[in-house]
Amino acid sequence: MRVRAGRVATIGRVSRDHLSIAEARRVALAAQGFDRPRPGGRVDLRHLRAVIGRLGLLQLDFVNVVVPAHYQVLYSRLGPYRMSLLDKLAYHRRELTEQWAHEASLVPVELWPHLGHRREVHPIRPRGFDSFLDQHSGYVDWVLEEIGRRGPLAAEDLPMPDGVSRHLEGSWLGTVPRALLEHLFGRGVLAVAERRPSMARAFDRSEHLIPLEHHGRTVTRDEAQRELIRIAARAHGIATAADLADYFRLRVGEAKPRIAELVENGELREIEVEGWRGSAYLHRDARLPRRVDAATLVSPFDPLIWTRKRTERLFGFDYRFEIFIPREQRRWGCYVLPFLHGDRLVARVDLKADRANGRLLALATHYEPGTDRAEVEPALNTELETMAAWLELETVVRSANASLS
């Protein structure tokens, strides 16, 4: 991606209370960092910190059809970088921690106390597993003692009590040890210490991993929700109440009083956006670039597009992730990435990394109506080549049907 940063004008201090949809779109892209050029030199930890600080979290998804989503979110803004840098921030320097936030996410460790209210009510899964916890409390205690004695452990490291089946029929969690560790993680007793090469999580006591200044801090539910809405508002730039609530999976009814407080103290301003129903909220630091010159493929789990209704409102782009849909029912493809060109989502690319043969496969490309293909094609080809090099793939192969209208 080659991005030329446009001149920007701050609109947080402007008195007008209406934005066109094109202006709202540029505000949202700027808030997400897409109006900025990718770094010209080597990407380092400072660049990653800046992006994560702007977004507030990275949704975790390890589906590896192309690349795990959390790595691509950074790539879309920074260009090629060493993926080990993100692992270093999370699992070595421990500046980030895995938490249930939007979904499973990496969040700055400072947010540990603000997600405490979610940990308190984290559901017991699968249904009926609470009876196992009641009947085998000694096993639960033993697991915690083993972790304390041996250090971080994964589900595969844990044996079962005599006479108890290891497997959980009909549950995505698979085994009793995994369900138990997931439960203790969800409630904040454990935290993720590392990801093994298989991507399996190894857990340790949370107080061993989270600095005391955060682990020992308690914030009220209202204070926590206010901070989460504040982060969402800064990351979105312009948003509806539902958009702001969804960023950290809050209920809209819970979010609205916190939004009103942020309006009252001047951090948000209530405005209208062309074509949107009801009010929108503009963050006081939001910027309106004169133009956005982005050219990048966007992960399905990128905060820019993870709320599909917002994506359609901002871009007129009806996006559905079809990987879990039977092949014969798919419209666009298995792992389809929107292509952001300028300030529009102009195409959908069904992409696959063929690592065995060193190829990045563009299985199909579907252009949005009205797209100037002569203008977009060179930018898309450049981005595919850049992504292939980042993934250490030798060539890009575009199938014969990979340039469809």
Kindly give the residue locations of the regions a language model identified.
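Long, low-complexity intrinsically disordered regions
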Residues: R2-L297, D302-I305, R310, F317-V336, ...
